[in-house]
Amino acid sequence: MESALVTKTDVMHQLAKDYVVKGLGAKNFDAIPYADDVVLRAPLCPGGSQNPLFGKENIRQQWWAPLPSLVGDVTFIDSYVNEEETSVTAEFHCQILQPVCVLRIIDRFKINEEGKIIEQENFFDPRPVTNP
């Protein structure tokens, strides 16, 4: 009989997939396991990636607020966990409804011991949104 042992790596891969599918795809911010003091860097944040947003509720209000009306379908492609099991990346495609385009995204998440996201950085070319 094969054991169904769930490893930390398995949990991190699932977190990345759930972020894409249950968070962005289902338009459910509360499905994303952000720590209260999370830091987010994203090209479409006010000030871009060089100006991080701090705090879960601040991210909900500034970054997340327009997303449910802008995001269409998402397609999870793959994830990667680093050797130290402290970070996971998710590769996915995100359909944007206005202007119509598909963003090819890789997001990196740093995870704490409680399994919460403490840092997130989004990597993608924003030109399809900013210069359609």
Regions found by a protein language model. Give the residues of each.
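A solvent-exposed, acidic/Ser-Thr-rich amphipathic alpha-helical stretch
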Residues: 28-86
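Short acidic-aromatic low-complexity motifs
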Residues: 2-37
